[in-house]
Amino acid sequence: IQFKDNISIRESEEMDLFGYMKTNKKDEKDKKGGSLTREATVRLSNAISLEPYRSDMDFLNNKGFADRIGEHPNLANIEQHLSYYTYTVTIDLSKIGKDGDIELDNKEKCRRVVEFLEIIKVLNRNIRGRQENLSPLFVVGGVYEIANPFFLGRIKLKGDKNGFKINKQAIEEVIQGTFLGKDLKEFTYVGMVDGVFINKEEFKGLFEDNFLSVDKFFGQLVKEVKEYYGVN
């Protein structure tokens, strides 16, 4: 199962943002077959737990069905892990909407990126009869000269009797760096949800005017993406 041969990034945002591979079957003309590929322009890291797994289990059975037919229920168990997770999203704005001889206009490129950012802001998933909220509680990043996951592996969690805090040191070290002679701190913003982490004031002092709410953080990214593509 794969994308149709006649479908391109022009029709498919999924192909544009997350790449594709189309394989060709061997035939009399093409003895070797082959594949047509495009790398993802939006890269997502694995979601990594910030807390250890403590062997929590959820025990299930089909008692409702079994009772209806007078049988004994079947038992099952599922590993459960309630934790904070961290993941990194990297978007190469220069490659959005480009594939071979196809290039979309800047307005369409911008629309696709903006919609993706809006989705991340309210991300959730449906699984096993429940809906889980995956929207971010803490975000850090910006629009840079290079599509690089600067903060991958830098988000660490500390916990004590007062609550949880985000480790500031690793993030501070990143923003103190430079790229092409420009300070990363100048282009970096942070967003936090109130009442979740107890060291909000530390980040407010570190980022000053670039300390925002999560909603305003994404609003700032949308603004800079529009500026990049020259779209109002």
Question: What do the PLM-derived regions correspond to, one by one?
Answer:
Residues 1-232:
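RNA-binding basic/glycine-rich loop and surface signature characteristic of RAMP-family CRISPR effectors
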